[in-house]
């Protein structure tokens, strides 16, 4: 707070150290895999054909969504440095014929289009308010008419005082990122509304650690 800048830098996929990068990705995969087992079975994607897993890293969610929806294919969009590890995980899952990987930076580059589902899991908290709004706008623009956009985040109460885990995670983003933060339901809904989306609501799922899906 005194310096108005992060006090430390998190491990990330954008590092030249291959071992550090794969360690980070494996950690993210293990977390995402455990979360996906709880959330994906309760999300109805029947009739949907092509999912964008934005910032999907190793494709853990794409893998689970495809397993639960036999007619679904998916594209994971993440940094090019993620590709080798992601493609190995996807191949090991037996999904290489249904899940592809596109390398790029969703904060600075346009996204491919033609999707009828976009899945944004735990990527907005690493970005500031304006950047998060722009990410949601890009994701919405990648959808065909009638497309569905889903955002999974640690969601703060509207007064920002809780629940405990999203509030503590908000502090973690303060010390670890330039502008990252946890967001409230109203803020996430605002991003979606300003991106031209309709029928915005939080799904009635009981997920751990204050996690929610819009």
Predicted regions and their residues:
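Conserved Class I S-adenosyl-L-methionine-dependent methyltransferase catalytic core
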Residues: 1-49
